[in-house]
Swiss-Prot record:
Note: The basic functional RuBisCO is composed of a large chain homodimer in a 'head-to-tail' conformation. In form I RuBisCO this homodimer is arranged in a barrel-like tetramer with the small subunits forming a tetrameric 'cap' on each end of the 'barrel'.
Protein's UniProt name: Ribulose bisphosphate carboxylase large chain
Native organism: Liquidambar styraciflua
Name of the coding gene: rbcL
Top enzyme category: lyase
CC annotations in GO: chloroplast
Alphabetized UniProt keyword annotations: Acetylation, Calvin cycle, Carbon dioxide fixation, Chloroplast, Disulfide bond, Lyase, Magnesium, Metal-binding, Methylation, Monooxygenase, Oxidoreductase, Photorespiration, Photosynthesis, Plastid
Length: 475
């Protein structure tokens, strides 16, 4: 018998199953500055005590398994195990509580969102003792965040590259999202950029389909960008979607975009995966490309209140993995987003230091130290009447993206772009003059429409459009 086995036997190893809380529920534990902290919304099965359910989450997302094993004696569980260190009830819910879990930093590979999520939101979400489980927030310590490159460039470098300051950036998703030929697609891009937008965008569905192969799209969009730049004197861009079936193909598309000299590419980071996204972010930093991120598939993960993962966690993960823009809801448009919660994760994307604020869904103080910020993108069902609210809610460091709100203009794409640019400039000027955008927004738009026929036509078309549904993402 080996000495290690004898040592294990000598301390009284007993095969079988024991309660998780005996090992993984440690209310006396004082968290370390280097711990990754998680807040889980836990809904246990009937008869499962909160302490046992919280400890089970800590165990199954770190070192634990369903039974006692011999090899526990070959390592130091106290050093590596996750710990449920605090439990609190959820207001208004009888059978729900928030379990706070601390994870030692050594459990995670440096610079890998993939590895972090494999542990924290892995098999534990299928655990039978739980009816539902949702990861509400993570605290990423500087000791871990410093192992990530983060966004390829960040907010200030992007503004310097584009030479655009003092206002939100304007964008437009080209519609119809599928079915256009590359040449007609490029024409729409040119018209929108020529009309005054800063960016146009591939829809997340657009990769390389039979009706429009990626290389053709890239070429016609590059032509549109350079023509619009020459005519306006402004730097323009189009989010060329490099998302592909393999990482190698994705990088090949990004290389071609760089060779064309365009400023920005795009990636669907959830469907593409964090490993692919981090690889593309590294390529973009090394080669001077901005990186726009779409969050297609996020609602599958984050929309249910009791199970899954809140978008603020996905937003933090994106800042670590890398992206210069990410879609973040609108508050006022057709897509999900309650104001205070949305502003909470918008701050987590942009700011260096964010204090704990439960009224905005922020469970932990987050210090990003030197990790660059990400521009939030407001997109989905917005039009010129929303411009004052969007400018007031999101501020200058944002991208306001009007797809149908540009291309649906009765006079065409270029007038639609003109209407949005005039509305934005009017709102920024009014704000800078001290006017209240929340209270005077409609009047500001009406005043501007008197000297912009394009804006007047847009105001008439969308004056009755509303999306009046309650947000599901509430505290």
């Amino acid at each position: 018998m080996s000495p290690q086995t004898e040592t294990k036997a000598s301390v009284g190893f007993k095969a079988g199953v024991k309660d998780y809380k005996l090992t993984y529920y440690t209310p006396e534990y004082e968290t370390k500055d280097t711990d990754i902290l998680a807040a889980f919304r836990v809904t246990p099965q009937p008869g499962v005590p909160p302490e046992e359910a919280g400890a089970a989450v800590a165990a199954e997302s770190s070192t634990g398994t369903w039974t006692t094993v011999w090899t526990d004696g070959l390592t130091s569980l106290d050093r590596y195990k996750g710990r449920c260190y605090h439990i609190e009830p959820v207001a208004g819910e009888e059978s729900q509580f928030i379990a706070y879990v601390a994870y030692p930093l050594d459990l995670f590979e440096e610079g890998s969102v993939t590895n972090m999520f494999t542990s924290i939101v892995g098999n534990v979400f299928g655990f039978k003792a739980l009816r539902a489980l949702r990861l509400e927030d993570l605290r990423i310590p500087p000791a871990y965040s410093k192992t990530f490159q983060g966004p390829p460039h960040g907010i200030q470098v992007e503004r310097d590259k584009l030479n655009k300051y003092g206002r939100p950036l304007l964008g437009c998703t080209i519609k119809p999202k599928l079915g256009l030929s590359a040449k007609n697609y490029g024409r729409a891009v040119y018209e929108c950029l020529r009309g005054g937008l800063d960016f146009t965008k591939d829809d997340e569905n657009v990769n390389s389909q039979p009706f429009m192969r990626w290389r053709d799209r890239f070429l016609f969009c590059a032509e549109a960008i350079y023509k619009a730049q020459a005519e306006t004197g402004e730097i323009k861009g189009h989010y060329l979607n490099a998302t592909a079936g393999t990482c190698e193909e994705m990088i090949k598309r990004a290389v071609f975009a760089r060779e064309l000299g365009v400023p920005i590419v795009m990636h669907d980071y959830l469907t593409g995966g964090f490993t692919a996204n981090t690889s593309l972010a590294h390529y973009c930093r090394d080669n001077g490309l901005l990186l726009h991120i779409h969050r297609a598939m996020h609602a599958v993960i984050d929309r249910q209140k009791n199970h899954g993962m809140h978008f603020r966690v996905l937003a933090k993960a994106l800042r670590m993995s890398g992206g210069d823009h990410i879609h973040a809801g609108t508050v006022v448009g057709k897509l999900e987003g309650e104001r205070e919660i949305t502003l909470g994760f918008v701050d987590l994307l942009r700011d260096d230091f964010i204090e704990k604020d439960r009224s905005r869904g922020i469970y932990f103080t987050q210090d990003w130290v030197s990790l660059p910020g990400v521009l939030p993108v407001a997109s989905g069902g917005i039009h010129v009447w929303h411009m004052p609210a969007l400018t007031e809610i999101f501020g200058d460091d944002s991208v306001l993206q009007f797809g149908g709100g540009t291309l649906g203009h009765p006079w065409g794409n270029a007038p639609g772009a003109v209407a949005n640019r005039v509305a934005l400039e009017a709102c920024v000027q009014a704000r800078n003059e001290g006017r209240d955008l929340a209270r005077e927004g409609n009047e500001i738009i009406r005043e501007a429409s008197k000297w912009s026929p394009e804006l007047a036509a847009a105001c008439e078309v969308w004056k009755e459009i509303k999306f009046e549904f309650e947000a599901m993402d509430t505290l």
